[in-house]
Amino acid sequence: MKDLTAKQRSVLIFIEEFIEKNGYPPSVREIARRFRITPRGAQLHLVALEKKGYIERKNGKPRAMRVTKSVKNRVPLIGEIRAGEKKEAIEYLEDYIEVPGSFLSSGYEHFLLRVKGESMIEEHICDGDLVLIRRQDWAQNGDIVAAMVEGEVTLKKFFQRGEMVELRPANKEMSPMFFRADRVKILGKVVGVFRKI
């Protein structure tokens, strides 16, 4: 089965959630209304989903479709993040990985990053782990975040005091980093850690 565009993925998730809630699939018009596109645009998304093997439809019958491959709990793995010195993140779509739905917050995008380094070992985040990030541009003190500073990304605990931000490692062998708040961009908060044994 071929990869989906972001919009096709969103349409497929909408179809799955609609079926869960109502017991039947949405109409073409309901899909069009939800995504603020024309019915023809919605129809083209359905054709693409069918060609890629994610849904099956019966010609000529409204609402006669079923999902053949779920993507609802599949999250993109988009590269590596350094848990050590801040480094340029390597961002590219490696794969989609299924995660338990209980880890996903409704209304938020999520992504996975592979951890490189040992600055977060006292929080049980180790080299090679996958961290599940809930995409958000804010954090509370003590949150573990993926943060960008001057184009480089790091995984640290976040603390803000006035105009200063501390990005603190969870490894007593390493020192915290301090920056003006306007130099730190929060990419998201860690909401899960996955490890192969």
UniProtKB/Swiss-Prot annotation:
InterPro entries per the UniProt record, alphabetical: LexA (IPR006200), LexA-like (IPR039418), LexA/Signal_pep-like_sf (IPR036286), LexA_DNA-bd_dom (IPR006199), LexA_repressor (IPR050077), Peptidase_S24_LexA (IPR006197), Peptidase_S24_S26A/B/C (IPR015927), WH-like_DNA-bd_sf (IPR036388)
CDD domains with a match to the protein in the record: S24_LexA-like
Keyword Hydrolase (UniProt): yes
DNA-binding region extent: 28-47
One Pfam family linked to the record: Peptidase_S24
GO MF, one example: DNA binding
GO biological-process terms attached to the record: DNA repair; DNA replication; negative regulation of DNA-templated transcription; proteolysis; SOS response
Taxonomic superkingdom: Bacteria
EC number, as in UniProt: 3.4.21.88
Site (Cleavage): A83, G84
Keyword DNA repair: yes
Keywords noted in UniProt: Autocatalytic cleavage, DNA damage, DNA repair, DNA replication, DNA-binding, Hydrolase, Repressor, SOS response, Transcription, Transcription regulation
PANTHER family on file: LEXA REPRESSOR (PTHR33516), LEXA REPRESSOR-RELATED (PTHR33516:SF2)
UniProt record similarity statement: Belongs to the peptidase S24 family.
Note: No consensus sequence similar to the SOS-box from E.coli or from B.subtilis was found upstream of the lexA gene, suggesting the presence of another target sequence specific for the Thermotogales.
HAMAP family assigned: LexA
Oligomeric and partner information: Homodimer.
Name this polypeptide is given: LexA repressor
Species of the source: Thermotoga neapolitana
Gene from which this protein is expressed: lexA
